[in-house]
Every structure is written in C-alpha cells, then in structure tokens.
Amino acid sequence: MAVLTEKQIKYGFDYYHKDEKQLKSVVEVSEYDSEDKLMISCTQLDEDYSAKDKKRILQEWCSFLVEHPDTFTELMFCTRMLQDLFDAVCAQRRLKRLHIKWGVYPDISKLENLQELEYLHIGAGRSVSSLEPISRLVNLVALSIENFQQIDDYAPLANLKHLESLALEGDFASPKILKVRSLGFLRHMKQLRFFSFLTEKVIDKDYSPILELNNLEHLTLKSCKEVKQLYPQLIKLP
C-alpha cells in the first residue's frame, strides 16, 4: 500500500509540479499506445471536430474502458466528465490513481468497483448526493473532494482507515462555500497526516476535533473566529 511522500505532505498529493513528468494526453482511442497511465481529453472538443466525431470519440472511449478493464493504473480527466464516461472509468479494476477535474456525474456508485484505488481527486461534484461509494474504497491513501454541495455529513469518510491525506474544498471560482455539519468524524481519523479545509463552513462551529489529529504534518484552514480561538492549541500540533 502506498504511503505519502514528504513532497505530497508539503504540497498535497495532487499538486501540479512543473518539473515532474506529465501524463501523455490523448483525444482519441487511436492515439493510445499501450500506456498504463494516461490523460484522456475526449470531451469539450473544439470546432475542428464535427458533432458526429465528438459523439464517436466519447463512445469509443466508453467502450474501450469497459472492454479492457485491466488496462490502466492511473487516469486523469481535465475536461468535462459525463456520467457515461464516469461509469466506464469505474470498470478499470487495476486503477490506483484517478483525477477528475470537473463534470456532471450525480451517481458515483460504481466507484466502489475500484478497490485498488489509492489516490482520488474528484472535483466540482455539485450533483453528487452520497459519499457511501467513496467510503468503501478501503485502500485509499489520499482523497480530495471539491464542491459536493448536496452533502453536509462527511462521517462516512471515517471508514477509510488507511487515509493519510484529506482535502475538503468548496468552489474557488464562485462565492458558494461547502457546508459541513460537523468535524466530529475526524476523531476517528487520527491517522491523517495532511488535512486541508478551505472555502467551507462548519455548521456546529466546533473545530476542536482537529486537535485530536496527533499525526498531522500539514494543516490548511480557512480563517474564522472559531479557528482563531483555537490557534494556541493548533500550533502545538506536530
């Protein structure tokens, strides 16, 4: 099982480093050349592609991902993720790392199929309504969730006993913040080494569960009255 590196602790596991080798980016299945790590950009195609070709390209990728379930260990999607494509990605049973920048995928139930997954960034998930599929990814080491506007209870994440890095973010591009009912679930996640909590609001206004994260090496919080009151105790964390 993966363990976070010092670099991942300092910057975050999904931080973009210009000096690191980037994944090959492709549009069509025909560009694939036996790589097990790939960036697929098969949506939001420009006017160089006809409507017919756009539909074909998406369908070809969905079929390929389902029909070749042992192909990839890492996938990145920086263009719009659609539900059909999301479901197809979840057929990749060897996948260890998945990055989804944004999209519309209200049903994430098939994520549960990815039992080898260790690193997951799932962004702009405003239509997602349940955390249960994520809570069943027992091998997750690092998780970044962005803009899950329909969810305020993050207690299911306490089931992730190997999780070392957790980032809960709202929407940086708009005034919408993420509302979290309580941080009480953190009391059951003392293995965390990295915790980032930005553009959010804690409904019960209690940030004290963070003080029980004795293995924490990186902490990022939005400044607010409740955080400022805990500052003398927060700076004593490892």
Feature-to-residue mapping (PLM):
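Concave beta-strand-loop units of leucine-rich repeat
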Residues: 3-108, 116-238
